[in-house]
Swiss-Prot record:
Keywords: Ribonucleoprotein, Ribosomal protein, RNA-binding, rRNA-binding. It comes from Kosmotoga olearia (strain ATCC BAA-1733 / DSM 21960 / TBF 19.5.1). Belongs to the bacterial ribosomal protein bL9 family. InterPro entries: Ribosomal_bL9 (IPR000244), Ribosomal_bL9/RNase_H1_N (IPR009027), Ribosomal_bL9_bac/chp (IPR020594), Ribosomal_bL9_C (IPR020069), Ribosomal_bL9_C_sf (IPR036791), Ribosomal_bL9_N (IPR020070), Ribosomal_bL9_N_sf (IPR036935). GO terms for biological process: translation. It comes from the Bacteria. Binds to the 23S rRNA. PROSITE patterns: RIBOSOMAL_L9 (PS00651). The lineage of its organism: Bacteria, Thermotogati, Thermotogota, Thermotogae, Kosmotogales. Pfam families: Ribosomal_L9_C, Ribosomal_L9_N. The keyword Ribosomal protein applies. GO terms for molecular function: rRNA binding; structural constituent of ribosome. One of its GO terms (cellular component) is ribonucleoprotein complex. This is Large ribosomal subunit protein bL9. NCBIfam families: L9.
Length: 151
């Protein structure tokens, strides 16, 4: 008997996979517990529709992320922060600060989860910051950390 898994099943497969199982295992264990449904033509067409929608959504997400990355790369980002005479910052610049700067510059929302900062920035200068956007889109920007004039 062929079944479509509705949930991950240990030693059998992952959600959405079509598996061949014995009739007893399918009818007496998987189907009653809501772990699988019998692989009929209508269920297979539902699965195909769901997979197509998922694929379209992923493509849309990737396209939006690539467009956002293109807009980000067209800009030069500067952040003015309080720092000592030696260039050491009073505090640190975090991924949340960088995300806030990007969001402000672009006039859109930008999550701190998209900023891949290994460690907080603690000195003035130019830094390469990696970005990981949804849809597995990766890129990097250069951000200039400058001492603010106000003391």
């Amino acid at each position: 008997m062929k079944v479509i898994l509705l949930k991950d099943v240990a030693k059998l497969g992952k959600k959405g996979e079509i598996k061949e199982v014995s009739d007893g295992y399918g009818r007496n264990y998987l189907i009653p517990r809501g772990l699988a449904v019998e692989a009929t033509k209508s269920e297979l067409s539902k699965l195909k529709n769901i997979e197509d929608q998922k694929k379209k959504k992923e493509e849309r997400t990737k396209a939006n992320s690539e467009e956002l990355l293109r807009k980000i790369k067209q800009r030069h980002f500067r952040m003015k922060v309080k720092a000592g005479a030696s260039g050491k910052l009073f505090g640190a610049v975090t991924s949340a600060d960088i995300a806030e700067l990007i969001a402000k510059e672009l006039g859109t929302e930008f999550s701190k989860r998209y900023v891949d900062l290994k460690e907080n920035i603690k000195n003035t200068g130019e830094y390469k910051v990696n970005l990981k956007l949804p849809g597995n889109v990766k890129g990097s920007i250069i951000i200039a950390i400058e001492k603010s004039e106000e003391d």
